[in-house]
Amino acid sequence: MKVIDLAKSQQPAEYIEGTEWDRVTQDYIRQYKKILDAEQCRTIIAAANYGRWEEVTHNDTRMCDVSVITSRALDKILFGAFGGMLKLYASDFWRAASMNTDTGYTVVRYSPSDHCPIHHEPVGSGIRAMINLSECDGGELQFFGKEKVDSSVGTGTIFPSSFMFPYEILPVTEGYRYYVSTNFK
């Protein structure tokens, strides 16, 4: 998995140790540290907590809560962050440059014991992008049942969901994990 710290200019790509053999994660999954700063993350969480949450279930099992971003000011911040991630991603994968529509921004809240089981997006769903907004115990994004991504606040992850990469959100053990996500088509 390629990890890029946006606070450090002109740095070589770093790969997470122990994943060198797996070309799928090395070649297509990218993480961008500090795509949002901590204050922006707190603002997004506060706005979502002020709004309306909807419970998400799968087969009668609770998974998480979601809230849609409706504020123009937050939309502008997220448009810049996700657009920046897509631009950086397209510099590595030119086909991503053809993605010109996002699906809006959804804040996802995982409470203690909440999780999203391993799954993949349907073929043709484009590119999936997520930004971690909070620190907590558990709730990490994991690919292929074994490779966790950096879960520091403000880190964005982007990958081609059309490749059907199996991913999951691990159970939260303490606190709340917030992500904001979108899909590019």
Q: How does the language model describe each region?
A:
Residues K2-M99:
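Non-heme Fe(II)/2-oxoglutarate
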Residues F79, G83-K185:
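Catalytic core of non-heme Fe(II) oxygenases with the double-stranded beta-helix
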